[in-house]
């Protein structure tokens, strides 16, 4: 369990800004005293708001993305480490690997999260359909979304592990994920001619592409030269199960 954060078009410079809760689980295989291989699952939320981050407050954009992340990484212990050995019970480590994640971006309108992704197979435009809206709410067509709901990333980071008993260990780590998408925040390139608009149950119209109404098509909306990142800082507890050959496999929730 820990916190997750985002860095990208709305927040290019401030780690841990607007951090959110993240949680998940890990299965770890201790190959030897130096090398460990593991599979991680994490459910994380990342968000940013121009009015709070103030990198470009005049845009007045905001987003919240829900992320389901599955990664496979290798850890290298700087010191010989073995859970249950009082002489080898602590070590800093580094890790790296590959990750696949599913994400859904939302915009916040008057405290309500509006889903920014749905492609209509007939018109190749996006409409808001899930979760269901009231009958008198509408979603206007917008340009086809320029990303898939599934992304790939390279996770890497540093941490420290400490054996608490013969079978239990604790780890603390900081992790970054370099993604290959610029649409984790639904912001990229320039303002299009066709805007995403939402009308609430009271008939109030909101422009999700340009809330200010001050930008013309072709003006810069985001920075497409750099893809988005997200990171996590977490603490985990693991429990070691001995395999038949004596090697350990740590199963945990964090």
Language model: regions and residue ranges:
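Outer-membrane beta-barrel transmembrane domain signature
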Residues: 99-228
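Short glycine/proline- and aromatic-enriched beta-strand/turn motifs that initiate or cap beta-hairpins
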Residues: 1-30, 105, 230, 234, ...
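Gram-negative (and chloroplast) outer-membrane scaffold detector with strong preference
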Residues: 35, 40-127
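Repeated loop/turn-to-beta-strand initiation elements of outer-membrane beta-barrel proteins
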Residues: 34-37, 82, 167-170, 243-246
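Structural signature of outer-membrane beta-barrel domains
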Residues: 4-8, 40, 44-48, 99-105, ...
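Residues on the lipid-exposed face of transmembrane beta-strands in outer-membrane beta-barrel proteins
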Residues: 1-3, 25-29, 72-78, 96-100, ...
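Residues that define the transmembrane beta-barrel architecture of outer-membrane proteins
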Residues: 17-23, 66-70, 90, 146-154, ...
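Extracellular loop and loop/strand-boundary signature of outer-membrane beta-barrel proteins
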Residues: 7-14, 56-64, 81, 140-146, ...
């Amino acid at each position: 369990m820990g916190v997750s954060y985002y860095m990208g078009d709305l927040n290019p410079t401030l780690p841990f800004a607007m951090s959110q809760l993240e949680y998940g689980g890990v299965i770890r295989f201790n190959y030897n005293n130096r090398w460990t291989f593991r599979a991680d699952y994490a459910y994380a939320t990342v968000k940013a708001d121009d009015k709070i981050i103030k990198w470009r407050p005049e845009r007045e954009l905001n987003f919240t993305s829900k992320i389901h992340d599955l990664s496979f990484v290798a850890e290298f212990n700087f010191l010989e480490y073995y859970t249950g050995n009082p002489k080898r019970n602590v070590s800093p480590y580094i890790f790296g690997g590959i990750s696949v994640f599913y994400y859904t971006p939302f915009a916040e309108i008057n405290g309500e999260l509006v889903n920014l992704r749905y492609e209509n197979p007939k018109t190749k435009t996006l409409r808001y359909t899930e979760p269901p809206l009231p009958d008198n709410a509408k979603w206007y067509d917008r340009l086809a979304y320029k990303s898939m709901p599934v992304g790939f990333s390279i996770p890497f980071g540093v941490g420290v592990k400490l054996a608490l008993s013969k079978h239990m260990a604790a780890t603390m780590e900081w992790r970054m994920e370099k993604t290959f998408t610029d649409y984790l925040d639904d912001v990229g390139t320039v303002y299009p001619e066709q805007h995403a608009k939402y009308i609430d149950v009271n008939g109030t119209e909101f422009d999700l592409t340009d809330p200010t109404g001050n930008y013309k098509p072709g003006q810069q909306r985001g920075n497409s030269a750099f893809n988005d990142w997200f990171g996590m800082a977490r603490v985990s507890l693991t429990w070691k199960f001995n395999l038949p050959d004596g090697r350990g496999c740590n199963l945990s929730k964090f």
